Amino acid sequence: MTLEELVASDNAVQKMQAVTAAVEQLLVAAQRQDRLTVGVYEAAKLMNVDPDSVVLCLLAIDEEEEDDIALQIHFTLIQSFCCDNDIDIVRVSGMQRLAQLLGEPAETLGTTEARDLHCLLVTNCHTDSWKSQGLVEVASYCEESRGNNQWVPYISLEER
């Protein structure tokens, strides 16, 4: 491996770590500001009613769920809709870390009902210009990935 290859590899690792941290920061901020839609069904409803408010779509899946055909079909439809509406998309693994970031599911009538974390939409208010640094960094990463013909970039959220 040449020096240039080593430097490029180190830069790629640092970039991935920065984008992962930006996604985590963005999710926490969006949830706190009530700008996060969680769940495949809820995401589909929102994109049908107000697609212009959506600024980022995260499709989350772990390796053991990759064979879930129904989920893959949902993802394909959501990706298509996002591409048609110029919504940035990121594929994410690390469902447990995602659950940690978004908090434990609320208890409903004595039973714990797990939320569907497979699709997350970050929305932007039409009335203000809400832009977090995390959103800017993730959008930049998505644009850079599209320039490299990777239309749906992938990141891995690591448990802590």
From Swiss-Prot:
One of its GO terms (biological process) is positive regulation of p38MAPK cascade. Gene3D superfamilies: 3.30.1330.30. Pfam families: Ribosomal_L7Ae. GO terms for cellular component: cytoplasm; nucleus. Belongs to the GADD45 family. Interacts with GADD45GIP1. This is Growth arrest and DNA damage-inducible protein GADD45 beta. It comes from Mus musculus. The gene is Gadd45b.
